[in-house]
Regions:
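Hydrophobic beta-strand segments that make up the repeating blades of beta-propeller
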Residues: 8-13, 57-62, 109-113, 192
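Gly/Ser/Thr/Pro-enriched helix-cap/hinge segments flanking short amphipathic alpha-helices
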Residues: 77-225
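Beta-propeller blade repeat segments, especially FG-GAP/WD-type strand-to-loop junctions
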Residues: 16-31, 66-81, 117-132
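Beta-rich catalytic cores
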Residues: 16, 41, 65, 92
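Short proline/glycine-enriched turn/loop motifs at strand-loop junctions of beta-rich domains
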Residues: 14-15, 63-64, 147, 186-187
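Beta-propeller blade termini
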Residues: 1-4, 42-52, 94-103, 123-125
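Carboxylate-rich, polar loop motifs that coordinate divalent cations or form catalytic acidic clusters
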Residues: 4, 20-23, 47, 57-58, ...
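Conserved loop/turn at the beginning of each blade in beta-propeller domains
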Residues: 38-39, 89
Length: 225
């Protein structure tokens, strides 16, 4: 999660409060508040822009209690989204993954269940119309493999927003090796910088939305949208 060209940390806890650590100068400040802070039997934390409005959401996947979803607004303000029955109040959530599975530019959320009982997989996506309100950046290293650990920064007239490739992947969380950005209202003049794991940075100008851009360390190509 980052909306200021600086990476932040989201931490979920069973016995202590959930936290959002935002770096300010040389220290981190916890900006979590309200319902977000309440401890839960959390198994997975995922940050992604599920509805392509240009503001990321934080998904909290719990086991044996309802899942929660929060939108990150300006200045770190958190707005809880009512998931209703899709909160899976009796779900035995274990892991989750986020990816554009059907390649329509809208992210899907796959949730796995089990551990204390048999439950099926569930697959969700936002109920929004397909459009060109997204930009997807897929960095590849010199060998053509996903550039895990590379940091992509989108700059526009409204924001600087950094995402590190596969930063959220781990034991129970998985994400595709793509930086997915929804587009805000009135947003334009898009530029992208890619900082590779060797410390070097390449800069690119984005002329069209609704596409997936594939960056290589020496050049750039555009894949079909």
């Amino acid at each position: 999660m980052c909306i200021r060209d600086r990476l932040d940390i989201v931490s979920g806890n069973w016995d202590g409060e959930h936290r959002i650590f935002v770096k300010k100068e040389n220290t981190f400040k916890d900006i979590a508040e309200g319902q977000f802070k309440i401890p839960s039997k959390i198994r997975t934390v995922i940050s992604a822009d599920f509805d392509n409005d240009g503001y990321d959401e934080i998904f909290l996947n719990n086991i044996g209690e309802p899942n929660k979803l929060f939108k990150i607004k300006e200045k770190g303000e958190l707005k809880e989204i009512d998931l209703a029955i899709n909160s899976e109040p009796n779900g035995l959530g274990t892991g989750a993954a986020v990816a554009d599975i059907d390649k329509d530019g809208i992210l899907e959320l796959l949730i796995s269940h089990g551990e204390t009982g048999n439950q099926i997989l569930t697959l969700y996506k936002a109920d929004i119309k397909k459009g060109n309100n997204f930009i997807r950046i897929k960095p590849l290293n010199k060998n053509g493999a996903p550039a895990r650990g590379a940091t992509v920064t989108l700059t526009s007239n409204l924001r600087e927003h950094s995402k590190t490739i596969d930063a959220g992947s781990g034991y129970l969380c998985q994400m595709e090796p793509v930086a997915h950005y929804g587009i805000r209202k009135g947003e334009k003049d898009f530029k992208v910088s890619n900082k590779w794991t060797n410390g070097k940075t390449n800069n690119y100008k984005i002329t069209k939305t609704g596409r997936t851009y594939i960056f290589k360390q020496s050049n750039m190509t555009i894949s079909p949208s």
